[in-house]
Amino acid sequence: FSYRNYLSQKVFPNLDKDILDINNNYKPDLILLGHNNILQKNTLIELKKKGTKISLWYEDHVANYGPNWRNNLSLIEKNNDLIDTYFITTHPDVIRTKINKNKLNFLPIPVDKNIETLSIYKHKHRYKDLFFALSHGVNFGGLRQNTRDERENFLNNLVKLGKNINFHVLGINNDKPKWNYDLYKEMMICKMSLNLSRGKPLKYASSNRIASYVGNGILTFIDEKTKFHDFFSKNEMLFYKNEKDLAEQINNIKNDINRINKISANGKKRYFEIFNNLIISDSIIHKTLGSTQKYKY
């Protein structure tokens, strides 16, 4: 169940009591807190009495220059003496926190063959050059009002520089974000995509759109300051310095469909080789429980 049931719909009025009851029934080795940290301290103490490990994964910004980063960091720092491991979508080296650094681990956004099912590079009718979908949170129904989003400045500059580029940008000019298959349909008419997250580009930091793009086989551009070139070569992903450099790279490749398709296919293959859901799950279990790892990472 989702913790949001407790906070909004109040389907289960006694969250901590229910968690303790479930724990007594199943006696788990590991409890994984998914993008939340709302259990009371006494509840965590009780859960750990029989050796249960507690881990937390978190996707939002917890380093400077990202939206709401202070609140996000405060949230995960709560009860950090009782949480055994953390998995965050930014390299731990760039985070200043009271959490013991040995507990912090980088969490790549995983792909799943049952979700990232497309091979967009195989589609014949892709008449748009570059795809980008702007949103203010996963599955948030619309764009938040009165929210300053620096990505719009980046996109406006890019459009001005790319007069000969056929853009397909969703989520601006009051256009509501699209999700799931509706999003996939929009991606399938495009040759390339832009992975642009809110905030300052930081080492290994990315929103979960990167899995949707690369995992579905569409050539993806990402800021070189994220250092994703540690994982991907220029035959699997393309890296830009700024808006001008990005516009030049797009113009240089947009008519070379064979090269676009090759990079797209290579990127999808590589992403599934190193960041699929089985590997990421195994790394969480191994790093938290000390179990034998099944994969190299």
Sequence positions of predicted segments:
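Nucleotide-sugar donor-binding catalytic core of glycosyltransferases
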Residues: 1-4, 10-18, 26, 34-35, ...
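Conserved acidic donor-binding segment of nucleotide-sugar-dependent glycosyltransferases
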Residues: 237-244, 252-257
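A charged, aromatic-enriched C-terminal amphipathic alpha-helix characteristic of glycosyltransferases
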Residues: 254-288
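N-terminal pre-catalytic "stem/leader" segment of glycosyltransferase-like enzymes
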Residues: 1-61, 85, 280-297
